[in-house]
């Protein structure tokens, strides 16, 4: 049984609740354990995963959050840099599922977060689980 860490950037509670429900359900349905921590925003997710990875206590990671486009360039910075940070960590053989939604509006976020629709939280957890399998396969 593996243990995953869900790292959530909790900014929109109702949207994060949906993502978290999907991720937890996918992990539990696969027979694994999980813990959840909260960070201030999407930019802090990669750093938290890097710190947790150093502990050696987790087999995989699920990144969750919602970034909704506003009126400034901040959306692009947060979206691009959080994704870049997660990608850099994955290149170090960390099994990470990226469930940080980058959307134009709340309606898009709801569609992607609901388990009955796109279930991006569940998909991120399944991606992390699959990457864990691949890492184990290549390790021998």
UniProtKB/Swiss-Prot annotation:
Keyword Protein transport: no
Highest taxon, organism lineage: Bacteria
Stored InterPro entries: LS, LS/RS, LS/RS_sf
Entry GO CC: cytosol; riboflavin synthase complex
A molecular-function term among this protein's GO annotations: 6,7-dimethyl-8-ribityllumazine synthase activity
Annotated binding of (2S)-2-hydroxy-3-oxobutyl phosphate, by residue: 71-72, 112
Record field: catalytic activity: (2S)-2-hydroxy-3-oxobutyl phosphate + 5-amino-6-(D-ribitylamino)uracil = 6,7-dimethyl-8-(1-D-ribityl)lumazine + phosphate + 2 H2O + H(+)
Active-site residues, record numbering mapped to chain: 74
Pathway the protein takes part in: Cofactor biosynthesis; riboflavin biosynthesis; riboflavin from 2-hydroxy-3-oxobutyl phosphate and 5-amino-6-(D-ribitylamino)uracil: step 1/2
Keywords attached to this entry: Riboflavin biosynthesis, Transferase
One GO process term, biological-process aspect: riboflavin biosynthetic process
Spans through the membrane: none
EC number(s) on file: 2.5.1.78
Binding residues annotated for 5-amino-6-(D-ribitylamino)uracil, in chain numbering: 11, 42-44, 66-68, 98
Pfam families, per database record: DMRL_synthase (PF00885)
Its biological purpose: Catalyzes the formation of 6,7-dimethyl-8-ribityllumazine by condensation of 5-amino-6-(D-ribitylamino)uracil with 3,4-dihydroxy-2-butanone 4-phosphate. This is the penultimate step in the biosynthesis of riboflavin.
Family as reported in the entry's similarity comment: Belongs to the DMRL synthase family.
Entry protein name: 6,7-dimethyl-8-ribityllumazine synthase
Protein's gene: ribH
């Amino acid at each position: 049984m593996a243990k995953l860490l869900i790292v959530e950037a909790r900014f929109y509670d109702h949207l994060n609740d949906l993502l978290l429900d999907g991720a937890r359900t996918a992990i539990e349905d696969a027979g694994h354990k999980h813990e959840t921590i909260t960070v201030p925003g999407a930019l802090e997710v990669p750093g938290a995963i890097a710190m947790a990875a150093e502990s050696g206590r987790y087999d995989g990671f699920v990144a969750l959050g919602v970034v909704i486009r506003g009126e400034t360039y901040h959306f692009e910075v947060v979206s691009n840099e959080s994704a870049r940070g997660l990608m850099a960590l994955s290149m170090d053989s960390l099994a990470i599922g990226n469930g940080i939604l980058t959307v134009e509006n709340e309606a898009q976020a709801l569609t992607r977060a609901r388990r009955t629709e796109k279930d991006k939280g569940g998909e991120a957890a399944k991606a992390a689980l699959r990457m864990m399998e691949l890492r184990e396969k290549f390790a021998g």
